[in-house]
């Protein structure tokens, strides 16, 4: 069975939504939402508006990762899904395919330099990562070459996919965007198509960690090695992509840093076997189903009452090592007031 429900713009248009979703103006889940605890998820996706979320500050790691993905995709992709003038996702022919790699890297590096650092530490990262982007990109090209991506057709990037209730049993769709899908061309009765790719690739970049201040006042940095095993959250993301194609397409998870690349697949990672992917997809659905049940208990109330009653049942985990970082002091105070801790 091929799970093809091409999502171009808004999951809201895919099917009827439950009452709580309509009242709270939510229409989908995503692997990113899985990766944060319930309390942080509730605040970011039910309290903050989409505009407020988009206004949250980025950091140098995120911007550098975007730069690397852009370089790899612009050089290799046949098609890149992008938002058009009316905020509608559309597959567009890549006009920069096979353009000189170094030229693309220089252009993306210049765009990265436009990032406005959040603080002194982020500024130090910004300066450091400018020196690392070239190496990370080159390792990315090497990894993709090893997988034979460059010689396959078609290569599609940033395709938005949606898993609906028929597959997940959730009220809301689960939405994601693939870094790369490649291959799978078929010819039938003279018509060439690629209904199912030959492979799915998810790329994760790693950047040197900030160390202690030197006597000179400069920041020291610690180089990272590729992980011995993938991040659980990254495997969840891969499982979502695999489920979309009914686990018929192999998934490759690539880690890149300035020193090396590492490719995980079903041969060296249990989480990327069919059984592992199915298990992780089930785990993701379980988390989202819990959140739906929490909200549905109060769906006959008004939106603010739904939020307040749900908050009373959730630990905000303000001590979490990263999920409340970068949310801004004003929003953090707002969240703590919501949970009555200040």
Label each PLM-derived region with a short phrase:
Residues 162-164, 206-208, 257-260:
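Short, solvent-exposed loop/turn segments at secondary-structure junctions
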Residues 68-69, 176-225, 241:
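Conserved catalytic cores of phosphodiester-cleaving nucleases, focusing on short active-site segments
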Residues 156, 182, 199-203, 250-255:
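A structural signal for short, well-ordered beta-strand segments and their strand-loop junctions
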Residues 213, 228-232, 243-342:
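Metal-dependent nuclease catalytic regions and adjoining charged, substrate-binding loops involved
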Residues 171-175, 194-200, 261-263, 267-269:
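Short, mixed charged/polar active-site loops
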Residues 1-192:
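Metal-dependent nuclease catalytic cores that hydrolyze phosphodiester bonds in DNA/RNA
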Residues 221-235:
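A short acidic, glycine-rich active-site loop
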């Amino acid at each position: 069975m091929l799970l093809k429900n091409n999502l171009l713009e808004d999951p809201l248009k895919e099917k009827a939504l439950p009452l709580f979703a309509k009242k709270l103006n939510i229409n989908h889940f995503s692997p990113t939402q899985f990766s944060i605890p319930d309390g942080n998820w509730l605040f970011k996706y039910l309290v903050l508006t989409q505009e407020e979320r988009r206004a949250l500050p980025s950091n140098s790691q995120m911007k550098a990762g975007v730069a690397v993905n852009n370089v790899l995709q612009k050089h290799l992709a046949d098609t890149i899904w992008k938002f058009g003038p009316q905020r509608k996702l559309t597959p567009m022919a890549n006009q920069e395919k096979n353009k000189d790699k170094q030229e693309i890297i220089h252009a993306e590096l210049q765009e990265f330099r436009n990032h406005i650092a959040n603080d002194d530490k982020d500024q130090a990262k910004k300066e450091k990562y400018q020196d690392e982007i070239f190496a990370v990109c080159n390792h990315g090209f090497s990894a993709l070459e090893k997988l034979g991506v460059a010689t396959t057709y078609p290569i599609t990037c940033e395709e938005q996919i949606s898993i609906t209730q028929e597959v997940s049993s959730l009220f809301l769709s689960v939405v994601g965007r693939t870094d790369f899908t490649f291959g799978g061309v078929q010819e039938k009765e003279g018509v060439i198509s690629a209904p199912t790719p030959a492979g799915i690739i998810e790329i994760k970049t790693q950047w040197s960690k900030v160390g202690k201040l030197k006597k000179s006042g400069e920041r020291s940095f610690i180089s990272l090695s590729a992980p011995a095993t993938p991040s659980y959250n990254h495997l969840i993301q891969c499982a979502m992509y695999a489920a979309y194609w009914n686990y018929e397409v192999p998934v490759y998870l690539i880690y890149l840093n300035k020193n090396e690349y590492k490719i995980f697949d079903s041969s060296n990672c249990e989480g990327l076997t069919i059984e592992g992917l199915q298990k992780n997809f089930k785990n993701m659905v379980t988390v989202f189903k819990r959140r739906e049940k929490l909200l549905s208990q109060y769906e006959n109330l008004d939106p603010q009452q739904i939020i307040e009653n749900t908050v009373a049942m959730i630990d905000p985990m303000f001590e979490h090592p990263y999920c409340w970082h970068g949310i801004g002091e004003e929003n953090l105070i707002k969240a703590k007031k919501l949970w009555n801790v200040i």
